[in-house]
Amino acid sequence: MKINGNEIRPGNVIEHEGGLWAAVKVQHVKPGKGGAFAQVELKNLVDGRKLNERFRSAETVERVRLEQKDYQYLYENDGMLTFMDNETYEQIELSREWVGDRAAFLQDGMKVTVESHEGKALGISLPDQVVLEITETEPTVKGQTATSSYKPALLENGVRVMVPPFITTGERIVVDTNEVTYLRRAD
């Protein structure tokens, strides 16, 4: 679908220079002289490169709609992560390297959303929060709770986060998967 340069919004995916790019930041500029334009920060969906472009209002770009499909995480085998489509029971494999650091937060049976274009996976969305157990953290020192200091903790998936001093080894906490930060104790 073709759209004008001034209609680009953050989150839109456009076809540009032979690739698919996501608009990260968009700033509309109307200078005193000349026509209005949109200053757009783009991120390549395949290799992650960033690019700044100007699109004039009269210029048209091809907006791409990504297919979003829900999958269930099954298991990992030799660096390949296996997901199952809940409707067709079809399985797909994505490399752990392609999923990136967020692969550490995958849990058996977790529902994820895979974004694809023309059958090629471009992105994966995990739930915003997961519950994990702390396997190792320093003990609380009496009197240390007066200040708002944080201490490092190792989670069951091998990821390190900073937690408040009252959190102890063996507790289950809620972690933000986007920022990789402690949110609260799990219920």
From Swiss-Prot:
Q: One of this protein's Pfam families, by short name? A: EFP
In the record, what terms sit under GO molecular function? translation elongation factor activity
Major localization listed first in the record, in broad terms = cytoplasm
Tell me a GO cellular component: cytoplasm
Keyword Ion transport assigned: no
Q: In which pathway does it act?
A: Protein biosynthesis; polypeptide chain elongation
InterPro entries reported in the protein's UniProt record: Elong-fact-P_C, NA-bd_OB-fold, Rib_uL2_dom2, Transl_elong_fac_P/YeiP, Transl_elong_KOW-like, Transl_elong_P/YeiP_cen, Transl_elong_P/YeiP_CS, Transl_elongation_fac_P
What functional role does this protein have? Involved in peptide bond synthesis. Stimulates efficient translation and peptide-bond synthesis on native or reconstituted 70S ribosomes in vitro. Probably functions indirectly by altering the affinity of the ribosome for aminoacyl-tRNA, thus increasing their reactivity as acceptors for peptidyl transferase.
Q: What is this protein called?
A: Elongation factor P
The organism of origin for this protein: Parvibaculum lavamentivorans (strain DS-1 / DSM 13023 / NCIMB 13966)
